């Protein structure tokens, strides 16, 4: 019998007997464990061989045998839990231990660096599962980061300085305003072993042609081996950067036939997905990666929803030794903001917008927040920390305003906290705030009726590119803000848009109301090198490494 199963049987027996040695019979014990008399005898003999108990059998009808426990079920449970932790079987650990506080304590004690069988393993604690990693779908901040570790694209944007770099394409050139040519590397392999072909690249880029920022791609052809020509319907100075974004990452052309591709995707990036469940995401360095192999062999993201209630609990990778703790932080390039929905009467009413943005001002939100949040929130007066576009102007409450509907996406504790503060403030003005909490896909499409939406945006480098690209990618914003998005996209592609002025107009009209900038924090270890937090609050796994202990 496998050791894990035997341990479970012993723990169950110990619990049924309340840990007390006693006189009993095989039949009674077999009934406790719901097994045959013969199997019970085998179990007892095996457990006795392990030194967990003694079984002094008495022969004869009516005679009772002596069962003596030498080991406690709690001790064995702890040993089993340690084994499950080492094997990264978090789902089984939760079932075994049951108590969430105990599970959390065990997980935290095993965070950070681990060195096993010559492999460097990084363990990270996160507050929610990362189940959808499909490029081109509605991805949140953390899923966007993980997708960049799994997939490659024609180009890549350096997370630290925002500069454009080669990826699958080693060079490219603009033949004409409507014609670009990319030269691709041969010998690139997918995680499932197949070599990348031009058809994979063409299929991957054609599948995103329905997205607003890629709708101007007219044709994609390969005139010669490892050469890709992209023809446009309008000029686009940003095209090389656009092809380095997550939607444009390269998938195997048969991706739709592969089982559970969204949660277990296959790319050509530095890490391959080994496991992805509600309790854990495990990715492993891809030995056949065409670039520099990752220095950390394995990254395990353990999911513990309970840390969502901790303001700074977004990403933890510190070990148990307090003296090794090191904190990396940065003010996010983006903010929480209110989005007024022009499709509803109250959302489109300028008086409502002016008054709501006045009473729910950034300073009011921070004032009514608990101290733990005040330390992490910074009043926002623009979509970026460097911008000061919003002005707080006193406004009178519109007559007849009695209720408003606010919608945000779930699995985000700070959304609930901010919404609760808003509810409290509006109630003091005799306005009822009705709150809807929906899943991220529903939020992204924006097809639910709501007066106001509570959103957050994290922009990546370079900001001149990503601010408009991010806002234009979200269907919800296009539904709520009645401007000519296509005309603005054309101006942006031509380099004719003043981005700061464009964003200032959105803020001035109260279509978008910046609320709070958030401090992004990683709780790390001093022994880790190359850990540089990006604008998404994560770090590039393949560039991080562990310094060996001093000799």
From Swiss-Prot:
Residues 1-116 form the HTH marR-type domain. Residues 163-492 are annotated as: Solute-binding. Coiled coil: none annotated. Keywords: Activator, DNA-binding, Repressor, Transcription, Transcription regulation. The keyword Plastid does not apply. One of its GO terms (molecular function) is transcription cis-regulatory region binding. GO terms for biological process: negative regulation of DNA-templated transcription; peptide transport; positive regulation of DNA-templated transcription. Residues 26-49 bind DNA. The keyword Electron transport does not apply. Binds specifically to sgrS promoter in vitro. Activates the small RNA gene sgrS under glucose-phosphate stress conditions as well as yfdZ. Represses its own transcription under both stress and non-stress conditions; this repression likely provides one measure of control over sgrR at the level of synthesis. Might act as a sensor of the intracellular accumulation of phosphoglucose by binding these molecules in its C-terminal solute-binding domain. NCBIfam families: PRK13626.1. This is HTH-type transcriptional regulator SgrR. It comes from Escherichia coli (strain K12).
């Amino acid at each position: 019998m496998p050791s894990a199963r035997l341990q479970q049987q012993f723990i169950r027996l110990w619990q049924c007997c309340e840990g007390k040695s006693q006189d009993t019979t095989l039949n009674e014990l077999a009934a406790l464990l719901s097994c045959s008399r013969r199997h019970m005898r085998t179990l007892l003999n095996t457990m006795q061989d392990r030194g967990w108990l003694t079984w002094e059998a008495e022969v004869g009808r009516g005679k009772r045998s002596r069962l003596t426990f030498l080991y406690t079920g709690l001790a064995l449970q702890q040993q089993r839990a340690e084994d499950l932790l080492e094997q990264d079987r978090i789902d089984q650990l939760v079932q075994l231990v049951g108590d969430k506080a105990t599970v959390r304590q065990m997980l935290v004690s095993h965070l950070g660096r681990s060195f096993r069988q010559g492999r460097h393993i990084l363990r990270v604690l996160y507050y929610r599962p990362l189940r959808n990693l499909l490029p081109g779908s509605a991805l949140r901040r953390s899923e966007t980061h993980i997708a960049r570790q799994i997939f490659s694209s024609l180009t890549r944007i350096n997370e630290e300085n925002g500069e454009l770099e080669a990826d699958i394409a080693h060079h490219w050139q603009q033949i004409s305003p409507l014609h670009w040519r990319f030269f691709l590397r041969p010998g690139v392999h997918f995680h499932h072993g197949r070599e990348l072909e031009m058809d994979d690249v063409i299929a991957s880029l054609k599948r995103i042609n329905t997205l607003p920022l890629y709708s101007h791609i007219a044709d994609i052809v390969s005139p010669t081996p490892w050469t890709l020509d992209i023809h446009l319907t309008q000029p686009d100075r940003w095209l090389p950067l656009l092809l380095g974004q997550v939607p444009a990452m390269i998938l195997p052309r048969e991706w739709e036939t592969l089982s559970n591709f969204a949660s277990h995707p296959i790319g050509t990036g530095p890490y391959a997905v080994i496991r992805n469940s509600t309790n854990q995401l495990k990715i492993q360095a891809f030995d056949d990666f065409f670039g520099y192999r990752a220095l950390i062999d394995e990254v395990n993201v353990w999911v513990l929803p309970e840390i969502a209630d901790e303001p700074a609990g977004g990403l933890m990778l510190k070990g148990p030794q307090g003296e090794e703790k090191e904190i990396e932080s940065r003010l996010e390039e983006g903010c929480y903001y209110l989005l007024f929905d022009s499709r509803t009467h109250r959302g489109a009413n300028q008086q409502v917008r002016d008054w709501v943005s006045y009473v729910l001002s950034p300073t009011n939100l921070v004032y009514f927040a608990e101290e733990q949040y005040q330390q992490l929130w910074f009043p926002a007066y623009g979509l970026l920390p460097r911008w000061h576009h919003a002005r707080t102007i006193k406004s009178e409450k519109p007559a007849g305003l009695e209720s408003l509907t606010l919608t945000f996406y779930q699995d985000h504790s700070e959304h609930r906290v901010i919404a609760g503060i808003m509810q409290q403030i509006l109630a003091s003005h005799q306005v009822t705030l009705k709150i809807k909490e929906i899943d991220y896909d529903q939020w992204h499409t924006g097809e639910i009726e709501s007066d106001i939406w509570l959103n957050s945006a994290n922009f990546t480098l370079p900001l001149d590119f990503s601010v408009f690209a991010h806002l234009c990618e979200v269907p919800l914003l296009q539904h709520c803000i009645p401007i000519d998005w296509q005309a603005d996209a054309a101006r942006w592609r031509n380099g004719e848009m003043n981005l700061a002025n464009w964003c200032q107009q959105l803020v001035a009209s109260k279509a978008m109301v910046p609320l709070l900038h958030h401090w992004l924090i990683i709780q790390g270890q001093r022994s880790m090198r190359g850990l540089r937090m990006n604008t998404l609050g994560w770090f590039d796994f393949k560039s991080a490494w562990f310094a060996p202990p001093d000799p």
